[in-house]
């Protein structure tokens, strides 16, 4: 084995030289230079400074403006809540541990940080699944009289939390475990060992199949069907031009969210899968650190995409920030063009 396994950790370095120490008790400066840990801390500080205000503002603006409280927006708000969980429950911890060069909060703190990171990522993924299904039902109309309403949105939000907890909670109760990864300053699922005492192998397989592969299959199926339907509707002019434009805008926004999710999380999932399927292989701490920390940037992109691509929300946000007056002066003019209330468009 090219790593050193302890009771609650796995360090990607052989202890033949005797320098390896517990990541819960000693700085890990033998894995990387101190300045590299400082860079991680600076990166986490940036994510906190950007991630907290923009996600909190997304929630606050929606509460302030009744016209934004549409069923589809419930799912988008769920993404903001998940991102805030990641920022407050995970990023603050990782910032502090990176400044110290090791996971100072011990195994319990590792469980907390790993839980929030996994929970936030999974809520985001399953929210995208719900959005994909919503787009499929609204645009493709497999059920002609179905309308995506408030109750459906609430059930969708509940579903995302149930599925996310089904992935993030088991390591806390003995099925797999959370351990420090990469440079040992952040925690995640143990992909590094089989650890039969906690049935680690079965959990990792379960996680990759149920909580990564299946959601992606659903997403790609829904959007594959959606592309064909939109092209066919455009060719036959089955919808009004205004309705088609609104549907396309919302669909485009959600697809970009999916692409951004894949860009952030597929590198991490790919590296984790490689490590799991190549037990004992030789890899350095940076190999997992870069994709793990890059995935954390997902807490920023969803609200940014939403603000950039939804003119109605953008105007409401400016109105809130500017104490009730939109400096651009086109709050109502843009309301029709980019409403995310397209979930309520009646079937043609």
From Swiss-Prot:
Q: Name one GO cellular component term.
A: membrane
| Chain positions found as N-acetylmethionine | 1
Q: Looking at the record, which segments are called Interaction with SAG?
A: 330-348
Lipid positions (S-palmitoyl cysteine) = 322-323
Q: Which Gene3D superfamilies match?
A: Rhodopsin 7-helix transmembrane proteins
Topology in the lipid bilayer:
Multi-pass membrane protein
| Residues modified by glycosylation | 2, 15
Task: Write down what this protein is called.
Answer: Rhodopsin
Q: Which gene encodes it?
A: RHO
